[in-house]
């Protein structure tokens, strides 16, 4: 097919329950950069999300983007950090792309779709956190291209991770 020639059509669509196993599989390859989630947690996160879409190429899910608004019941500590400081925002819980398609514009296509969605709902602030330790330079570069800037840092006592809190005004 076209995919073998490096030519493919990206379809971005709303996530369905039948996608959760593939989301689990893709996330499992990047747990050190995101965090571990099981199927029950994916179901819960999906129920709290305001935007949860997958990218499909030739009927195969190759990535996903999971986002909550400030009004979400999401229980994450990093999300709460933003709730305490910003009144209206969209929080990127995770964006994960299959390694086969890394650095080919798939993440950018998802973020462009998210920004369009945000505009329809009058959201102008995107928030996320990026690992500083262990470092995630690919994510830092990707988010910088979308205008994300550091607004704080967090490290939990005894925890191996240090994160950079990032905000982009869109």
Describe every region a protein language model picked out.
Residues 66-94, 158:
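Conserved acyl-donor/pantetheine-binding loop and adjacent beta-alpha core of acyl/acetyltransferases
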Residues 118-132:
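Conserved GNAT acetyl-CoA-binding A-motif
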Residues 10, 60-64, 90:
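Glycine-rich phosphate/pyrophosphate-binding loop shared by adenosine-nucleotide-utilizing enzymes
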Residues 10-25:
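A short beta-loop-alpha structural element at the N-terminal edge
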Residues 97, 103-116, 145:
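Conserved acetyl-CoA-binding loop-helix of GNAT-fold acetyltransferases
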Residues 132-152:
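Conserved active-site alpha-helix within GNAT-family acetyltransferase domains
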Residues 32-58:
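Active-site rim helix/loop that mediates acceptor-substrate recognition in acyltransferases
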